[in-house]
């Protein structure tokens, strides 16, 4: 049950600096569709270094790598999935920058910044021993910004 106290506890746990660092690490790696292997490797490295067990599932699309991790309560319950893509549109690459307090760069808002927010949410859930039932699954992959 979401109580006002729980919501405030989660808000207080958010480390904006860490989200920006994670997002910049992802944004600074060019990753046009079908070429997101390096950024997927970086995300897996970030998660592993932070103590998460990372899966790299084999797929029928080897040019579209995926990264999977989860926070599991150990108790039966539903699974909430955070899903995001790591590839970017085929425009000239732009490295990360902070402009007027906003993160810019290739994929900053679609969707590497969102993936960084997922990572922070997983950290908070794990460190707060949440959820109490079920699990939270995070998947990140290539092949979203396809030409079709």
PLM regions and their residue ranges:
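Acidic/His- and Gly-rich active-site-bordering loop/insert found
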Residues: 2-108, 127-132
């Amino acid at each position: 049950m979401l109580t006002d106290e729980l919501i405030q506890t989660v808000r207080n746990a958010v480390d904006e600096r860490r989200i920006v660092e994670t997002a910049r690490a992802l944004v600074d790696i060019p990753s046009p569709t079908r070429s997101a292997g390096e950024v997927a490797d970086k995300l897996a490295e970030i998660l592993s270094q932070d103590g998460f067990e990372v899966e790299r599932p084999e797929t029928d699309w080897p040019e579209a790598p995926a990264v999977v991790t989860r926070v599991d309560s150990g108790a039966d319950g539903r699974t909430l999935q955070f899903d995001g893509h790591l590839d970017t549109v085929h425009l000239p690459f732009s490295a990360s920058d902070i402009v007027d307090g906003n993160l810019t760069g290739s994929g900053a808002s679609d969707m590497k910044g969102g993936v960084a927010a997922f990572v922070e949410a997983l950290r908070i859930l794990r460190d707060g021993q949440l959820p109490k039932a079920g699990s939270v699954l995070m998947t990140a992959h290539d092949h979203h910004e396809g030409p079709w």
